Swiss-Prot record:
Belongs to the bacterial/plant glucose-1-phosphate adenylyltransferase family. It catalyses: alpha-D-glucose 1-phosphate + ATP + H(+) = ADP-alpha-D-glucose + diphosphate. The gene is glgC2. It comes from Pseudoalteromonas atlantica (strain T6c / ATCC BAA-1087). It is an enzyme of class 2 (transferase). Pathway: Glycan biosynthesis; glycogen biosynthesis. This is Glucose-1-phosphate adenylyltransferase 2.
Length: 420
């Protein structure tokens, strides 16, 4: 397909309403999501996961957005109000928060399709030609205008963004599809234990990214039909897509960069994947460029002083090497290597931090040694604590240790007051 004109793209994005599904817990993240929804989880030194699909919308020119919330949504809603509440409805801009409120029945959101169905009246009031359904819990940068143009030019009623994923990663985790030579979807399974491999690559399969484009009236018709089906689980992957691919044009859209290569996309749904995706950012040329001025990631920014590194004495030098250190941090006579320090982190003298993710407001007292760990927001790690060097001792103290050796520490595990 030739490159569409800017005016054509502008018309498409103006005619589109984006609905971001941000109500999930992310149970595979264990205690890290005990007090927050997965889309509210911190990422990349200063952002939250929800900032990525929201920024993609704004950068793509889509400025009518709804965010569906449900599980422990207070911190997510607070972030949205503070960071995304500046849009002006009279200019055709809005980020609306849509909490589960039993709008069309006596039930809360029962699945991804039901979350959209219960907000049909709100979507209809916007009079869009197209509706984008977006997952609120993945990390990636994507120009949604391209998938919109592909959707219209292909004559699809529904388009599913996809990318090749290793079989072992997709098993039980992603929707998997099979397509013909034109990328029309022939089969779709939601989170199969034995995914169907690609014809030309038995090690990978074609996985859904959880992002969909619909013709609006087609979406409404099939949501209403699904709502009347007592056997439905009210889910796009389990019910809607399998029910429409036989009789309607439903196409896959491969997510790739300008060179045709597979683009960056991370599902940070486990502690290991969350840790690894953050660790990728400390490399000299990370796969995700957070410094791209042409595609900025927007977020709420608290007014904080600059990061500070103090003390230069023998065995007591405040330094950070191959690390990301955010505003308000103080590295006082400590060494931080290959780590991310979110805002307001304070690491005291003689402590050593390596390959770790320190979420906001963490304080590491003196003489601590921490390696390959995730320290949750607000943790105060006592003086002399050693984490990540002996996993048997870590488990004995109540810390969670993953199969790949990442140690999670939360306030409850340290006996501190709990909150979001």
């Amino acid at each position: 397909m030739p490159n569409p004109s800017p005016r054509y793209i502008s018309n498409l994005t103006r005619d589109t309403y984006a609905l971001i599904l941000a109500g999930g817990r992310g149970s595979r993240l264990h205690e890290l999501t005990d007090w927050r929804a997965k889309p509210a989880l911190y990422f990349g030194g200063k952002f939250r996961i929800i900032d990525f699909p929201l920024s993609n919308c704004i950068n793509s020119g889509i400025k009518r957005i709804g965010v569906v919330t449900q599980y422990k949504s207070h911190s997510l809603i607070r972030h949205l109000v503070r960071g995304w509440g500046h849009f002006r409805k009279e200019l055709g801009e809005s980020v609306e928060i849509l909490p589960a409120s039993q709008r069309s029945s006596g039930n809360w959101y029962e699945g991804t399709a039901d979350a959209v169905f219960q907000n049909i009246d709100i979507i209809r009031d916007e009079i869009p030609k197209y509706v984008m359904i977006l997952s609120g819990d993945h990390i990636y940068s994507m120009d949604y205008a391209n998938i919109l143009a592909h959707h219209v030019e292909s004559g699809a009623k529904m388009t599913v963004s996809c990318m090749p994923v290793p079989i072992e990663e997709a098993a039980g985790a992603f929707g998997v599809m099979s397509v013909d030579e034109d990328y029309r979807i022939l089969g779709f399974e939601e989170k199969p234990e034995n995914p169907t491999p690609l014809p030309n690559d038995p090690t990978r399969c074609l996985a859904s990214m959880g992002n969909y484009v619909f013709d609006t009236e087609f979406l409404f018709e099939h949501l209403k039909h699904d709502a009347q089906n007592e056997g439905s689980e009210r889910d796009f992957g389990k019910d809607i897509i399998p029910s429409i691919i036989k009789d309607h044009p439903v196409f896959a859209y491969p997510f790739s960069n300008d060179d045709g290569e597979v683009s960056y996309w991370r599902d940070v749904g486990t502690l290991d994947s969350f840790w690894l995706a953050n660790m990728e950012l400390v490399s000299p040329k990370p796969p995700l460029n957070l410094y791209d001025k042409k595609w900025p990631i927007w977020t709420y920014q608290e007014q904080l002083p600059p990061a500070k590194f103090v003390w230069e004495e023998y065995n007591r030098c405040g330094a950070a090497i191959d690390s990301v250190v955010s505003g308000g941090c103080i590295i006082s006579g400590a060494t931080v290597r290959k780590s991310l320090c979110f805002s307001n982190v304070h690491v005291h003298s003689y402590s050593e931090i390596e390959e770790s993710v320190l979420l906001p407001d963490v304080e590491i007292k003196r003489n601590c040694k921490i390696k390959k760990a995730i320290i949750d927001r607000g943790c105060i790690v006592p003086e002399g604590t050693v984490i990540g060097h002996n996993h048997d001792e870590d488990r004995a103290r109540g810390f969670r240790v993953t199969n790949k050796g990442v140690v999670l520490v939360t306030r409850e595990m340290l006996g501190l007051k709990v909150g979001i």
